[in-house]
Amino acid sequence: MVDHLANTEINSQRIAAVESCFGASGQPLALPGRVLLGEGVLTKECRKKAKPRIFFLFNDILVYGSIVLNKRKYRSQHIIPLEEVTLELLPETLQAKNRWMIKTAKKSFVVSAASATERQEWISHIEECVRRQLRATGRPPSTEHAAPWIPDKATDICMRCTQTRFSALTRRHHCRKCGFVVCAECSRQRFLLPRLSPKPVRVCSLCYRELAAQQRQEEAEEQGAGSPGQPAHLARPICGASSGDDDDSDEDKEGSRDGDWPSSVEFYASGVAWSAFHS
């Protein structure tokens, strides 16, 4: 699946085309041995609503971004190392089909494909690349995953106090630990979660109490064992109001429809959704 494409001219051209579409805002993607295996538009469930996003599957990373002009210009590039990825198949509902969750320690989110066949293609290709990466790096599969954010539209009231009703003046916030939609009063605290951010992040009141209790227990065990504790400025949870940490960098403009693609690639299409896998 990978070896015969590595270091070929066609693979280099494909990767260069991706770099060109992201332009100066994106990171360089060409590396010796890196292969572009698949690409396509999937629907990503963002904070406010589901939006089309461009995805590129390499043998060692998964790249996605916002669509400015389909197959011409992308932005908000995100790069996920595949050894950190775990997939979870989601059940079908009348309103939501062909969905699965991409889980990592830093961020987890839900995507959907245009058909069950396309979803299975993406899942099988990603899982095979993850297996190869884990074998190559000798790392065990990832077991810690960030909670996905519950979409804003899922609730009109705070999911913690169940009293505050959201409006144009009463905004929604998200707990970085559990992903719940909460009001400002129920998410006044911050806590340092190193796997998510080097800075303390907003958490809801329940998660704050649980995290603080867990931290106190760990500190007591360390003191009982006679081991030096973590420096206070790193170990202590940070309290206070949060205001500027709720932005979702994926909340960008939607893209246009597709143009023409070579007939030699395996292709799925429905509306703005499409996927192609190289072999």
Swiss-Prot record:
Cross-referenced Pfam families: FYVE, PH
Record has Transcription regulation as a keyword: no
Positions with a binding annotation for Zn(2+) 2: 175, 178, 204, 207
Family matches, as InterPro entries: PH-like_dom_sf, PH_domain, PH_domain-containing_F, PH_Phafin, PKHF1_FYVE, Znf_FYVE, Znf_FYVE-rel, Znf_FYVE_PHD
Chain intervals annotated as zinc finger (FYVE-type): 152-212
GO biological process: apoptotic process; endosome organization; endosome to lysosome transport; positive regulation of autophagy; protein localization to plasma membrane; vesicle organization
PH domain mapped to chain residues: 35-131
UniProt cross-references to SMART domains, sorted A to Z: FYVE (SM00064), PH (SM00233)
Any GO MF annotation of the entry: phosphatidylinositol-3-phosphate binding
Entry GO terms, CC: early endosome; endosome membrane; lysosomal membrane; lysosome; nucleus; perinuclear region of cytoplasm
Cell compartments where the protein resides: Nucleus; Cytoplasm, Perinuclear region; Lysosome
Tissue specificity comment: Highly expressed in heart and skeletal muscle. Weakly expressed in brain, thymus, spleen, kidney, liver, small intestine, placenta and lung.
Keywords carried by this UniProt record: Apoptosis, Cytoplasm, Lysosome, Metal-binding, Nucleus, Zinc, Zinc-finger
Superkingdom of origin: Eukaryota
Keyword Membrane: no
Region Disordered, annotated ranges: 218-264
Skewed-composition ranges (Acidic residues): 244-253
Region forming the signal peptide: none
Binding site for Zn(2+) 1: 158, 161, 183, 186
Domain notes: PH and FYVE-type zinc finger domains are required for lysosomal location.
Primary role: May induce apoptosis through the lysosomal-mitochondrial pathway. Translocates to the lysosome initiating the permeabilization of lysosomal membrane (LMP) and resulting in the release of CTSD and CTSL to the cytoplasm. Triggers the caspase-independent apoptosis by altering mitochondrial membrane permeabilization (MMP) resulting in the release of PDCD8.
Protein name as it appears in the record: Pleckstrin homology domain-containing family F member 1
Organism encoding this protein: Homo sapiens
Gene: PLEKHF1
